[in-house]
A protein has these predicted regions:
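Acidic, metal-coordinating catalytic segment for phosphate/diphosphate chemistry
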Residues: 11-47
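Charged phosphate-binding loop/patch that engages nucleotide di/tri-phosphates or the phosphate backbone
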Residues: 166-186
Length: 186
């Protein structure tokens, strides 16, 4: 299935997901180059909510740009299979050798505002990440490493603690809390 088909098959968890899914579907139809950063207004990203085998821990990275503990993930950069993106980013940003999808279906959807910032010496205007999240599982005993150009820490947290260490109120209260609520229903 392509992304549009996956999104149409996905049952939104709440109103935020329902509205964001509709926005993403509209942008897939109406916006050019949403799978690349050439579209400076909106573009696709994939995130990974990474849990250990018994679902008692969540992996977070201390994100240099946001100065907060956050999920792992990144830009599609031309890749239309966002599960591939989520897995690649999980490995690159954490050093995990053993990471796999808990399920191949979409776990969550979000349209996320990104404030203007400087990246690699260039100003990047405020824009929206059209984000698809996948639930991944990793071996908590795998060695972890920092990807210095993106993060300055990688660590496992209890799910509630993963919410608490995030200093971004919207992400903590509306995204990470939702992901953990969904985790409890599996």
């Amino acid at each position: 299935m392509n992304l549009e088909q996956q999104l149409l098959a996905y049952t939104p968890y709440n109103e935020q997901e329902a509205r964001d899914r509709e926005l993403i579907l509209r942008c897939l139809k109406d916006e050019p180059d949403v799978f690349t950063r050439r579209n400076e207004l909106v573009h696709m990203t994939a995130s990974a909510w990474i849990v250990n085998a018994d679902r008692t821990k969540v992996l977070m990275a201390y994100h240099n740009l946001y100065q907060s503990w956050a999920w792992l993930g990144g830009h599609a950069d031309g890749e239309t299979d966002l599960l591939v993106v989520a897995l690649k980013e999980a490995r690159e940003e954490s050093g995990l050798a053993h990471v796999r999808p808990v399920m191949e279906e979409i776990y969550s959807v979000e349209a996320l505002h990104v404030c203007g910032h400087v990246k690699r010496g260039q100003y990047v205007s405020s824009h929206i990440h059209l984000n698809v999240t996948y639930l991944l599982e990793a071996d908590e005993n795998d060695p972890l490493f920092i990807k210095a150009d993106e993060n300055s820490g990688v660590a496992w947290f209890a799910p509630k603690e993963a919410e608490d260490v995030c200093t971004e109120p919207w992400m903590r209260d509306h995204i990470y809390r939702k992901l953990n609520e969904k985790l409890r229903t599996l």
